[in-house]
Amino acid sequence: MKKLVIVSAFLAVSNITKAQNAEPAVQWGKEIENLQPGKSNLTQILKSDAGGSYAIREQGSYTDHHYLLEKYDASFNRVFSTDVTPPVGVMGNSNLVNKILSVKGKVLVMCDGWNKAEKTGSCNIFEVSLDGDVAKSPIVADKAIAEKQMKSASYFYDVSDDGTKLITFAQLPYEKDATEKGRLKCFETASMKELWSNEIDFAVPADKSPDNTIIVANTGDAYVLKKVKMDKNVWKYAMYSFASGNMKKDEVEIPEKVFNSSKMVINTKGDLVVYGTYATGRWTGNESQGSVYIRVDGITKAIAAKKVEPWANELIKAFMESKIGGKAGSVIPMEFKYMIPKNDGSVIAMFEDNKMDKAAVPGSTTFQYNYTYTSGSIMVLCLNPDGSQAWNNVVPKFQEIKTASETRLFDSFCYGMLGDRLLVFYGNTNVDYKWKDGAGRELYKESIFGKRVVNPTCLVMIDGKGSMKGVDNYYGWKEKTGLPLLKFMDGATFEMSLNPATFYQAEDGIIIYAEMPGQQRYKIGKLKL
């Protein structure tokens, strides 16, 4: 059985619902040997363009962990694989890799530094060229005094959509009986010149687990969404906007509601959009009673739109008809997965019905469990710039996978955009072994999808008006909401093997990363236009 990881997303499927063979072809590269099978995994696609594709591979043990930058040419042959792990330093003067970011023209290895003698934590940035050359010394983007390493500042980052701006946010060390503080800095990535910096006093009691979300626009303007728990089920919210470092604060009133799950994007008009779900009273898991929409004008930084409303009855009904469990009523138990900006300034929000169950392994002397991960339907909402709902739809599906791992390594679906059309890819684990077509003939799954296919990878398309396009009749297949991607599956397949962590929107196709059993060999291909 092969393992499949989708690692980028953009697919032009011409007339995909007009014919059963409307699937584009797949171009596969040559198989490549994995030099450290079992200890080496591709974890991130950084970029893919006419110059080639770049990926990060992690390998080694916890105490000897390495990061490799890999380049692949247009035919998906490996050009090089080079270690870009910065020097970890020595005891009392160390660098720990926090995150690896792709910016315009290079790669940034973001490290948390600690200097015991100075009692300072720092944000250290190592620049890496696209040829794999690592800078000998880091750019020290920020420093903060701390009593000890475990109590030093925490650093968070964001890169603008065009890769030209970087922000670093230092969550400054907790101090008892003091107010919470942070420091936000913006850099131009070409020269790594600091454009502006701002010290933030949030004017609320310091918290050991603060809740701040950051984002930066192509202009270098930045935003911080602040959530503060004041008391049991009592929260305060504020939006901090920064234009050239000048700060503007707006209190966001969401009375008697817990803004429990939210995401932020910069829409195509340059405005900030915040969207999420709320719960009233005690919040449990992903349950929500409604949604919160906020849009901040990209120029004036004023809150241009805000809408707080319960889920509509028709939406609850549509979701409940295809849900995998839970109680009916006004609560929708779903996970907020993605928010995607559209070309007209609207955004798409995607939610999924997820559940995890575990059962003790019979006869085991230690605490061992078997896990069942169930993923149900996807609820898709399109929101206008004023927060009103343009349309909604539900992608009905049922996926179940059983494993001994308490961590779900792969997600249940991935997405791509083709103009204003949304493409949803998922591994269909609910296909019968055999069925009858319209003529009464018996058909077998392996005769249609191939013996190597455990579960077919399927595609659903939702057009710009919210209409879902599936397959009216595919060999009499009962699951009519997805087009099985036969050519896509020919190279590699594995149940529910869609990994958004390595899902990258390229300009001219879907890049597929296929790993063989035992991780000894792998190959990369592209689902072409």
Task: Please provide the spans of the model-predicted regions.
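Short beta-strand elements that form the blades of beta-propeller/WD-repeat-like
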Residues: 50-62, 99-118, 164-177, 220-229, ...
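Blade-loop segments of beta-propeller domains
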Residues: 77-118, 141-151, 201-210, 251-256, ...
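Bacterial Sec-dependent N-terminal signal peptides
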Residues: 1-25
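Conserved blade-ending motifs and adjacent loop-strand segments that build the rim/top face
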Residues: 251-262, 308-328, 389-413, 453, ...
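Beta-propeller blade signature
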Residues: 68-74, 122-132, 181-192, 235-246, ...
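Loop/turn-rich, solvent-exposed surfaces of beta-rich toroidal or solenoidal domains
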Residues: 336-357, 361-362, 369-371, 375-379, ...
